[in-house]
Amino acid sequence: MRNGFGKTLSLGIQHVLAMYAGAIVVPLIVGKAMGLTVEQLTYLVSIDIFMCGVATLLQVWSNRFFGIGLPVVLGCTFTAVSPMIAIGSEYGVSTVYGSIIASGILVILISFFFGKLVSFFPPVVTGSVVTIIGITLMPVAMNNMAGGEGSADFGDLSNLALAFTVLSIIVLLYRFTKGFIKSVSILIGILIGTFIAYFMGKVQFDNVSDAAVVQMIQPFYFGAPSFHAAPIITMSIVAIVSLVESTGVYFALGDLTNRRLTEIDLSKGYRAEGLAVLLGGIFNAFPYTAFSQNVGLVQLTGIKKNAVIVVTGVILMAFGLFPKIAAFTTIIPSAVLGGAMVAMFGMVIAYGIKMLSRIDFAKQENLLIVACSVGLGLGVTVVPDIFKQLPSALTLLTTNGIVAGSFTAVVLNIVYNVFSKAKKIEQEADLAEQKTAV
């Protein structure tokens, strides 16, 4: 019994390590971009880790209302980074969490029938959106590589050397290691980079010593939420894109566990994700989605028991209650994070391209959908003021590359694929009716 629990515990720790880098990078990026204090940033990382555990347990615990019951780990989605920063800059932190709460409620409501809407989000749409997400995140990575936007030593050679050292370590680990070490290469790169940065005088431990030993979570840490239409629409789009990504993860895990997923299973999975997003907004954390890197770990270890993921969720919740653990993440220099971000966000772009590789580019319509959506998404990212003369209600939607590109991809897919398919079916039905009449 003891040996069995020890094995389950070790596997749970492996899953924590596999997703930990992704879990801490998002709050660090968003928190620094919104100008949070060290104390607030420590809380943001702590609550994010805690809520990752809660979200994971909600999904693993399958009941009649929610939970898909697969060995899936949930973490904060990279899709939300740019929109959260944009909303925070325009409306303030309270509106960020108001829009997350609203998007969580929306996901819960549409979970009953979202499985029927997946046809509106084929690979040509999701691949374009994921590619745009990666592209729009790259400026954040590059700014951090140089030392962080607005820093006194921005672009200093020491920052660039540190960032490229971290990136090189990650690349080498991917090339020359296998299995679990390969799956945590980004975390190892960050740890080694921070160790090197300490000897360069770029790491200060004051944040760790000042942090509380234990801190209970509290709702609305940053104040009462505010609600505005444009941010709600933006975060709702983010939530829907995350659902589409999660659907792929669910089916991948279904194949690994030899389980055929039904529409009811998917609905419960979506509902658990919506509940996680809602709680993330209430406790001032993040929107959550299924982490694909943990799917790779399930495949690697061959262990498909939900008990392992339950242990993972409990460990994450425990970590979130100790701010000193979160404070350690705040000492990571921006240049170290920047080097890791290039690999992480570059992988997002590569994953989007991989999704696009599954579509039929012999159809000119698909080429045009990708061209227009990625083109507009990138264009708005590079020239965010292009639509500033529009009414204020539309400004946030049109000055965010992810939203602009996503909207373009969805609309063009409906025009070229959904309507044309419906028209073709109607024509075939008319033809069949004519033949019957003859």
Curated annotation (Swiss-Prot):
PANTHER family: PURINE PERMEASE C1399.01C-RELATED, URIC ACID TRANSPORTER UACT
Role: Transport of xanthine in the cell.
Listed transmembrane segments: 11-31, 41-61, 65-85, 100-120, 121-141, 154-174, 180-200, 220-240, 272-292, 308-328, 331-351, 367-387, 396-416
Organism: Bacillus subtilis (strain 168)
Family in the record: Belongs to the nucleobase:cation symporter-2 (NCS2) (TC 2.A.40) family.
Molecular function via GO: xanthine transmembrane transporter activity
Pfam families: Xan_ur_permease (PF00860)
UniProt name for this protein: Xanthine permease
Keyword Cell membrane carried by entry: yes
Membrane topology: Multi-pass membrane protein
UniProt key word Cell membrane: yes
PROSITE patterns named among the record's database cross-references: XANTH_URACIL_PERMASE
Compartments it resides in: Cell membrane
Lineage: Bacteria, Bacillati, Bacillota, Bacilli, Bacillales
One GO BP annotation of this record: xanthine transport
Cellular component terms per the entry's GO annotation: plasma membrane
UniProtKB keywords: Cell membrane, Membrane, Transmembrane, Transmembrane helix, Transport
Database matches in InterPro entries: NCS2, UacT-like, Xan_ur_permease
